[in-house]
Amino acid sequence: MDYKLLLDTAVMSGEILLESGAETWRVEDTMLRMLRMSGLKTADVLALTTGFVVTLDDPAMDSMTVMRSVESRATDLNRIHAVNQLSRDFCEGNIDLDALFHRVRDIYRAKSEIKKNLLAMMATTAGFAIMFGAGFYEVLASALAGFISGIGVYGGKKAGMQSFLVNCIGSFLLAVTSILCVHYLPGTMDLNVIIIASIMPLVPGVAITNAVYDTLHGDYISGAARMLEAFVTAAAIAIGVGLGMLLLRPLVR
């Protein structure tokens, strides 16, 4: 077996999982299962929310250690599922190492589709608006606010901004859009319902869930870090919405 190729594959898999919002225990477990297929004496992984260290060692060879920093994080359950499934197939012997490497590399290189993401943002915000008892124009306003917010978030990430600023921009745009819709669209609309429905895609629910999972698995550092990340994200959303309402205060009714 090509141990270097196996290590590179495990590192790519771990990076994909961390970037996609997977729990740190899942990252460690997935990488360890791959590395233990080597049959070497030592295979260790230490994963945190911002990176990981992985080592392969055996008396018959020189040890190999890789440290990787992960700066960008988002939520992409499809990528997490795809990597986990490939890991299972590899450990069960359904695919060989070369096939595993190329499939993981394809996932690693694949770019997110902005059109699908924006449509998902619109559908999510509209769905929450309906759940909160919104009328037709309120649902329409929520979908539009989600669309504009999604463009702002995508543009901020594309420009390399920090996640705090990205969330501030997204929530600011959705607040401004919601207020303008309430002011200019016909009928009586509830601004609170529109804003609450529109911020749902930005709410750090996955980060909070992962914080609980990591803590229950004994990874207190990652659990505390993810909880702090969720708090900072929530603060950014509140600041963005507050600034938007402050800017258009004369139109708020």
Regions flagged by a language model, labelled:
Residues 1-95:
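Soluble N-terminal domains of membrane-associated systems
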